[in-house]
Amino acid sequence: MLFRSGREGFRKGMDLYFQRHDGQAVTCDDFLAAMADANGKDLTQFKNWYSQAGTPRVKVKEQYDATNKQYRLTLSQSCAPTPGQVEKKPFHIPLKVRLITAANNQAEQLLELTEPTQTWTFDRIDDRPVLSINRNFSAPIHIDFEQSEEDLLTLF
């Protein structure tokens, strides 16, 4: 929630939440309503975190085109069936990422995975980047992403 709203937005949401509900017995829906109202955002899909059991799994596929200096990142999400929930709706997964290259270090950005599969294209990437994903543990997920030992050393 913090990553989606930012510190200031999260604070606004908390202030509104306490203004409305201080001393009351409330629900997760009350909390989300305060966050949504304070920030003017639709958090309907975010409710899946509260209503669906299990931990989402995100599969990472990357492709670098040296000729066009373009990097494509495809993320696919799934969540295993649980008793009473065979079918799962896509989660709203906020993922902080950074592309690290020898030439430059791209700015950290927030990608919002809301569909079963989404692709992002990054232009003007001079070298094959090393992907740093789920920075600061931006989402409580499992990640399927095989990285070379060299790439892992770059991340340290």
Residue spans of the language-model regions?
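Inter-helical turn/loop segments and adjacent helix faces that build the functional surface
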Residues: 5
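Non-catalytic accessory/interaction domains
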Residues: 8, 15-156
